[in-house]
């Protein structure tokens, strides 16, 4: 139980922090960096698992030798790439057969797109890297020149799927920009891109170029307040993870039905200070419900069934071999549903909103247990968890506009609730 080594991963004085779990691959400890709203330049670091010493570090933006992949610097104005965001605070996946690990990079800085013309590579990108060297084998940018804060760090799920009659080793990503992506995880070839929530900032994705087909009326700027952009910066899906069932072949996805008004503002970079540069108001999307829990068929790119929720589905999903799927709601309900039909089989009200992930395990007594941690907070719960005005819809980077009434449904307080199966 004694500490074996300790190493500093970043500099808090310039806004760098660490909010992710590391991934150990062979003798490497892979760790990213947070701080995209502070002008932090994203990077991923490999440390020696035995000594803690840095083996390599690769950045999201900048010269090829620092990114491990060509084509970044020329997509930025001047030296904006030095504070270009692309932080790496999400989830990492590893394929031992291909010996590649995968992760997403976040939004560029600042949120005002007028200050950083160009594609802003490699923010908003899925990287495939070699864990020994850090060199990137491929990179796919989902949202070039992000003008909506569609922070691209969501998890990448590695599965083998039948795509167009052939089995492919793929990576599946449900991005905050509202599109579900299926890529060949060996080559980075884009195989599918389909909206899994209501999307109007783009009309689709060109599979040949990989670029979104944008609606120019929904592009944001510091010269106007762009109205009713869907999804909002809070994402078609935020950081709550999906679950995949090889029994049904479906992904189970907790989603948001939120849109926003967005206006960029001029902001100057100051080391260690917020570097946002936008006024945002999130609000309920079409139909008024703010969330939906869906089953998604990745081979067809279509929703199979959905359960609409009054508030966003901000907790993760758990699919089991018994064809039962669990998920939580911001009101505090833990629900069990039929994986094939979406019928609600059972639900239990926990003391606070659920933004964590249900889990299951086998105890020493041989019984199977299901557990969930409730306790509202985070971005969606900031109106309850923090002291801020509920009369200002721009507060909490726009979260108050979407969840002003959250206190009517959920209180603070963290509780771990555990259920034993018969």
Write out the residue ranges for each language-model feature:
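Short loop/turn segments that connect beta-strands within beta-propeller blades
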Residues: 48-51, 113, 131-133, 185-187, ...
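C-terminal structured "cap/appendage" subdomains that terminate the fold
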Residues: 177, 320-413, 417-422
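C-terminal substrate/ligand-recognition segments
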Residues: 235-263, 273-348, 352-361
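Asp-box/WD-like beta-propeller blade repeats and closely related beta-sheet repeat scaffolds
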Residues: 1-45, 49-50, 54-80, 88-89
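Aromatic (tryptophan-biased) beta-strands that constitute blades/sheets of beta-rich domains
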Residues: 2-9, 53-62, 67-82, 135-141, ...
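Repeat-blade elements of multi-bladed beta-propeller folds
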Residues: 17-38, 80-111, 115, 125, ...
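Short, conserved, GDST-rich strand-edge loop motifs in beta-rich repeat architectures
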Residues: 31-42, 103-120, 257-286, 375-408
């Amino acid at each position: 139980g004694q500490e074996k080594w300790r190493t500093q991963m970043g500099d808090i004085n310039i806004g760098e922090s660490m909010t992710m779990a590391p991934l150990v691959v062979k003798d490497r400890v892979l760790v990213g960096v947070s701080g995209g709203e502070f002008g932090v330049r994203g990077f991923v670091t490999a440390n020696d698992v035995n000594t803690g010493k840095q083996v390599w570090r690769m950045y999201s933006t900048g010269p090829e030798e620092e990114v491990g992949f060509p084509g970044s610097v020329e997509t930025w104005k001047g030296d904006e790439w030095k504070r270009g965001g692309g932080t790496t605070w999400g989830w990492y996946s590893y394929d031992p057969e291909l010996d590649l690990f995968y992760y997403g990079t976040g939004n560029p800085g600042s949120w005002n797109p007028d200050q950083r013309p160009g594609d802003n590579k490699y923010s908003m990108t899925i990287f495939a890297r070699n864990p020994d060297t850090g060199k990137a084998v491929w990179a796919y940018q989902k949202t070039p020149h992000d003008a909506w804060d569609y922070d691209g760090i969501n998890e990448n799920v590695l599965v083998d799927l039948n795509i167009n009659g052939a089995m492919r080793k793929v990576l599946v990503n449900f991005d905050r920009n509202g599109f579900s992506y299926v890529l060949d995880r060996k080559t980075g070839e884009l195989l599918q891109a389909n909206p899994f929530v209501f999307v109007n900032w783009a009309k689709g994705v060109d599979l040949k170029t990989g670029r979104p087909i944008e609606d120019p009326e929904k592009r944001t700027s510091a010269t106007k307040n762009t109205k009713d952009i869907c999804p909002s910066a809070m994402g078609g899906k935020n950081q709550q993870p999906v679950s995949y069932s090889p029994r049904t072949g479906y992904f189970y996805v907790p989603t948001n039905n939120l849109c926003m008004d967005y206006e960029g503002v001029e902001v100057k970079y100051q080391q260690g200070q917020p570097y946002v540069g936008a006024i945002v108001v999130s609000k309920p999307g079409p139909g008024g419900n703010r969330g939906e829990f869906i089953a998604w068929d990745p081979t067809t790119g279509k929703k199979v069934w959905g359960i609409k929720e009054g508030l966003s589905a901000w907790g993760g999903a758990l699919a089991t071999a018994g064809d039962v799927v669990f998920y939580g709601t911001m009101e505090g309900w833990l629900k069990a549903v039929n994986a094939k039909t979406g019928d609600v089989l059972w639900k239990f009200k926990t003391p606070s909103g659920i933004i964590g992930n249900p889990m299951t395990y086998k105890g020493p007594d041989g019984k199977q247990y299901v557990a969930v941690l409730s306790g509202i907070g985070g971005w969606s719960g900031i109106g309850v968890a923090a002291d801020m005005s509920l009369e200002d819809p721009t507060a909490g980077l726009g979260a108050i506009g979407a969840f002003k009434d959250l206190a009517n449904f959920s209180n603070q307080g963290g509780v771990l609730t555990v259920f034993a199966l018969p």
